[in-house]
From Swiss-Prot:
Its EC number is 3.1.3.16. Belongs to the PPP phosphatase family. PP-2A subfamily. Mn(2+) 2 binds at residues 91, 123, 173, 247. This is Putative serine/threonine-protein phosphatase PP2A-4 catalytic subunit. It comes from Oryza sativa subsp. indica.
Length: 315
């Protein structure tokens, strides 16, 4: 008989640890195990806010997109969870070849160490998008049915939309919204739904910073572009130092915008296995100093192992 997480000790127990170990070897869980795991995750995520408070020190990460081996590399460089406190800003699935293993591992870590990892929703944590960009097909291929896809996409509805590190770094997948000028407006949204095609929840997951001032029409067909004037006003009104977001490929792994009011963090190196970009993660320490750690794809055997650390003392 196949044992579930629950029958092997629950979220504190060895059963989950064994599953995490299995996932770290890129071996998927059974459908039954995924179902039990996601039921536990839902209970935890239901209690979290649309603006989930996070304490420093914390390591902030951008898109992963099913690049499982690069996620393992990220943990090697940034430190294991729970030794390191992590905040992931969405887009765990699609495009890469290991969306199933990637999202299952992150959800398992969330259930095992709920206070040490925060997982936000990205625009790809959606039923519609995953049917086009790979996660749906991957679930079908690996499990023989769409059940696991349905279990995960139902869970995605509960992922928090944003996080707030030490009341001064606002973290979210996409960007700002013309419908939202303060954090209480975010807190009051009903997030338990498929990502809408328009409106504030859509914007938070789809918008991008832009060189042009004001609000602009997004070339993505969802969300908006927003200028430095918008970022400055938003940060000022909400007593924020910084908006940290993901959602856009940046060649160095991170990119400042709007005179260091906004930073983009992208954590999938050599994106889609062909873009040649670096990835990065942002470490915020106890004193709220910021260090970007850049990394390259997980080394294949015989290749050099290179990491570049870039301290950043802008505060």
């Amino acid at each position: 008989m196949e044992e579930s997480v629950g029958s092997r000790g629950g979220s504190g127990g060895g059963g989950l640890d064994a599953q995490i170990e299995q996932l770290m070897e890129c071996r998927p869980l059974s459908e039954t195990e995924v179902k039990t795991l996601c039921e536990k995750a839902k209970e935890i995520l239901m209690e979290e806010s649309n603006v989930q408070p996070v304490k420093s020190p914390v390591t902030i990460c951008g898109d992963i997109h099913g690049q499982f081996h690069d996620l393992v590399e990220l943990f090697r460089i940034g430190g294991k969870c729970p030794d390191t406190n992590y905040l992931f800003m969405g887009d765990y699935v699609d495009r890469g070849y290991y969306s199933v293993e990637t999202v299952t591992l992150l959800v398992a870590l969330k259930v095992r160490y709920p206070q040490r990892i925060t997982i936000l929703r990205g625009n790809h944590e959606s039923r519609q998008i995953t049917q086009v960009y790979g996660f749906y097909d991957e679930c079908l291929r690996k499990y023989g049915s769409a059940n696991v896809w349905k279990i995960f996409t139902d869970l995605f509805d509960y992922f928090p939309l944003t996080a707030l590190v030490e009341s001064e770094i606002f973290c979210l997948h996409g960007g700002l919204s013309p419908s939202i000028d303060n954090l209480d407006s975010v807190r009051s949204l009903d997030r338990v739904q498929e990502v809408p095609h328009e409106g504030p929840m859509c914007d938070l997951l789809w918008s991008d910073p832009d060189d042009r001032c004001g609000w602009g029409i997004s070339p993505r067909g969802a969300g908006y572009t927003f200028g430095q004037d918008i970022s400055e006003q938003f940060n000022h009104s909400n007593n924020l130092k910084l908006v940290a977001r993901a959602h856009q490929l940046v060649m160095e792994g991170y990119n400042w915008a709007h005179e260091q009011k906004v930073v983009t963090i992208f954590s999938a190196p050599n994106y889609c296995y062909r873009c040649g970009n670096m990835a990065s993660i942002l470490e915020v320490d106890d004193c709220r100093n910021h260090t970007f750690i850049q990394f390259e794809p997980a080394p294949r055997r015989g290749e050099p192992d290179v990491t570049r650390r870039t301290p950043d003392y802008f505060l």
